[in-house]
Structure formats: structure tokens, C-alpha cells
Amino acid sequence: MKRSDRYSNSNEHFEHMKHEPHYNTYYQPVGKPPKKKKSKRILLKILLTILIIIALFIGIMYFLSTRDNVDELRKIENKSSFVSADNVPEYVKGAFISMEDERFYNHHGFDLKGTTRALFSTISDRDVQGGSTITQQVVKNYFYDNDRSFTRKVKELFVAHRVEKQYNKNEILSFYLNNIYFGDNQYTLEGAANHYFGTTVNKNSTTMSHITVLQSAILASKVNAPSVYNINNMSENFTQRVSTNLEKMKQQNYINETQYQQAMSQLNR
């Protein structure tokens, strides 16, 4: 008797099929999800938590930065030795821009590359290292001079952006040149030029000799470590820094080849 005939009857066929093994190739085990999926969910929660913390931190820093009134920067103009950047020769301004912030005229308060480097240095060294724009230095010198914390660096970014929105570049440069320490209790560029060289940075002055290219480079190079670099007894490191500054000034067209060669000749005497 054929197998098909044996189970032609529906009841008999059903009874037989109950005892036949079933093979479901699409069977998925029921139970706990794989560990990989669980790990991914945990990782996503951690990342979300970190993002929320960062957002809260930035929000708090922004709120705290609004307490600093950028209108107060105008008080710098009341200094007796204040000279506006409009009245300073281009090569003098170039000496500081070349050394401190060569993209000064192109950014809006902070330079992403330099700032990122400074923030990582702050985290790793627990100290603030380089990378600040001139605008940021204006903010630091006026509002946060004695604060060297990581939170200061973040607040500085917000305030610098507000400064850029309220003032033009020459005004910002004026605030910088007239509120920075040059050593020997000198806090303005004009005061430093008078004190160290007996010259003036005011191109309209007729009572004093005008500051030279080399003198400009020396003062711009000194602000990095005003208490260390001695103008009257220049170290090899200081001399090299001035030389580098002069090279940058030439490369960025603040001085020509003749001015560069003359300044280098005076430096190497």
C-alpha cells in the first residue's frame, strides 16, 4: 500500500503529522537580547549623558560670560599714554599681529585651530597654553587677568565673540596695545616705547623720534614673557624670537626686504 493512500483520510493524516518532526528554518530563540545590543544601548546612554553635561556646561558658561560688560573696554582709552591703532604705523601693528595672531583680520574672535590646541593643552597640562587670538587676549587681560582656569577659557570665547560684534578690528587692536604688560611696570605700547627706547608709536607726533621696525619687533616679542626677556641684555632665545618675528613681518608684507635687512643688521650688531 502506498504511503499516500495510507494517509488519505484527513483524520489519519492529521494524527500522523502530530508525531512527525517539524523543522522551522526561521525559528528564533526567545529570551534575553544579545549582549551586543545591550552594550550598544548602554553606550548610547553614556554618550547622551555626556552631551547633556557638555550642553549644560556651555550654557552655564555663556550665562556667566554675560556678566562681563564689554562696554567697559572703553575705559582703556582714558589712559594717559593711550595711542589709537589708527595712529600707529602699519609695521608696528604688523609686529604684534604677525607674532600673536596672524589671522586677526579674518576671524570673528577666535581661531578654531589655535583655540582647540589651547583647550587640549589646558586639559592635559592643567594650565592655559598659547593659541589665544588678540581678541581673546584683550578679554583675558581686562576681565580675567588672574584667572587661569579651564572655565575662564570657555567664558573667554563667548566674551571675545561679543567684543568682535561690538567693536571694529582697529578698536580691538587699540585695546590690546594699550592694556598689555611689557615689563618694568609698562602697560601700554606707547609707554613701553618711551621707557625702553625713548621713541613714540604715534606716527603723528613731532616731538619724539618714531619707533623703528626692530624696536617694534622687540616689544612684540617681549610680551610673551615680559619678566623674562631683557631688552638691555638680550638672550639668545630672545634674539631668535625677534628674528623670527621680523621674518614673519616680511612674509606677511608688513615690511619690505630693505626694512627687513636693515632691522636684521641692527639686531645682529
From Swiss-Prot:
Predominantly, its location class is membrane
**Subcellular compartments:** Cell membrane
Q: One biological-process term from Gene Ontology? A: peptidoglycan biosynthetic process
Stated membrane topology is: Single-pass membrane protein
Gene3D superfamilies annotated for this entry?
Biosynthetic peptidoglycan transglycosylase-like
Give the transmembrane ranges: 46-66
One GO cellular component term, please give it: plasma membrane
Judging by the UniProt lineage, the source's domain of life is Bacteria
Which Enzyme Commission numbers does its entry carry? 2.4.99.28
Q: Give the reactions, separated by semicolons, that this protein catalyses.
A: [GlcNAc-(1->4)-Mur2Ac(oyl-L-Ala-gamma-D-Glu-L-Lys-D-Ala-D-Ala)](n)-di-trans,octa-cis-undecaprenyl diphosphate + beta-D-GlcNAc-(1->4)-Mur2Ac(oyl-L-Ala-gamma-D-Glu-L-Lys-D-Ala-D-Ala)-di-trans,octa-cis-undecaprenyl diphosphate = [GlcNAc-(1->4)-Mur2Ac(oyl-L-Ala-gamma-D-Glu-L-Lys-D-Ala-D-Ala)](n+1)-di-trans,octa-cis-undecaprenyl diphosphate + di-trans,octa-cis-undecaprenyl diphosphate + H(+)
Task: Identify the enzyme class.
Answer: transferase
Keyword set, alphabetical order: Cell membrane, Cell shape, Cell wall biogenesis/degradation, Glycosyltransferase, Membrane, Peptidoglycan synthesis, Transferase, Transmembrane, Transmembrane helix
The annotated pathway is: Cell wall biogenesis; peptidoglycan biosynthesis
Molecular function GO labels: peptidoglycan glycosyltransferase activity
Keyword Transport found: no
Pfam families listed in its UniProt record:
Transgly (PF00912)
Q: Per its database record, what is this protein's job?
A: Peptidoglycan polymerase that catalyzes glycan chain elongation using lipid-linked disaccharide-pentapeptide as the substrate.
Q: Which family does it belong to?
A: Belongs to the glycosyltransferase 51 family.
What this protein is called in its record is Monofunctional glycosyltransferase
Q: What is the lineage of its organism?
A: Bacteria, Bacillati, Bacillota, Bacilli, Bacillales
